[in-house]
Amino acid sequence: MDVTEKFDLIAKPPTEEIVTKDELIELLKTNSKPKHYIGLEISGFLHLGSLISTGFKINDFIKAGIDCTVFLADWHTLINDKLGGDWETISKVSKYYADAFKLVCPRVKIVLGSELYDSKKEYWFEFIKFTKHMSLARTMRTLTIMGRTENEEKIDLAKLLYPPMQAVDIHSLDLDIVHAGMDQRKIHMLVREIFPKMKWKVPIAVHHKLLPGLSEPSDYTDSKILGKMSKSDSKSGIFVHDTDKEISTKIKKAWCEEGHVENNPLLEISKHVLFHEFNEILVERPEKFGGNVTYTNSSTLESDFLQKKLHPSDLKQTVSNYLIKIVSPIREKLTLNEELFQAIKKSA
């Protein structure tokens, strides 16, 4: 596989941004096995965005010859009060996350935050060195990476450790590529600003599209981040443990206004999930409604929907059919005992 083919794999949807493209091309030319990571909090049930779309993107990196790691941030999970801040539950759910990503991305490496900190004695020394380059105000502004805002009344001191820890994780893993959803962009830009000052390796940042929730968007100010599928809201997305019937019901109820393409969750799912895995999508409908039609790319599908050549009910049925094909095999192989299921559900 040549450099262009590798680049195209990394750049294909759901990738939304590469910082920078020229640096990535140079990396692919000069490094036969670049090191990648994506860091994840261990919180609620895995869903279409957090596991499947993310996992598909990781597989693109792997196909391009990249050495990929999923970093399960157990300490960050504790800091951010996820799973009730219970360490035993966090540890158990970490195993569930590891099993899930190994299932979807068989060749990925799994690293726990606690394992990294235990094995790297210089971590906290490097952490202090990094924080000397951060002001309190800048730290507060980066809290959006953990779903917080700088204006929240109750921000405990531990939460201020989260952004610099995430940055030092990147250095400690000696990464060439940092990968995340668009909601993590601030920390990656901070890394690219501060690392050169410290003479640390500066990674390329690759950000993928965050799948929107299934309800109508309530805020359009930043469609790249707001309204994403949430692990804490069972109605907002498709979860890997949803039954075929639950998937079908959720898609039928999803917001999908006729002719409206902006922030349309079903068009986003089609583009970033369905067309990632299927070369063509067949819409089955009676002859009186135009008959069957096959789409080979998301642009044509979106164009027909915009022009009202494709009705929302037909799009919903099609998305439901193909999602079931993707989710069902994962659900059948990914076991989750009742005790752990209830623990996650309780803390959601």
Name each model feature, range by range.
Residues G85-W87, D222, S270:
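Short secondary-structure boundary/capping segments
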Residues V178, E193, D222, S232-S234, ...:
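Domain-scale selection of a single, long terminal region
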Residues I204-D233, G237-I238:
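Active-site and channel-lining beta-strand-loop segments
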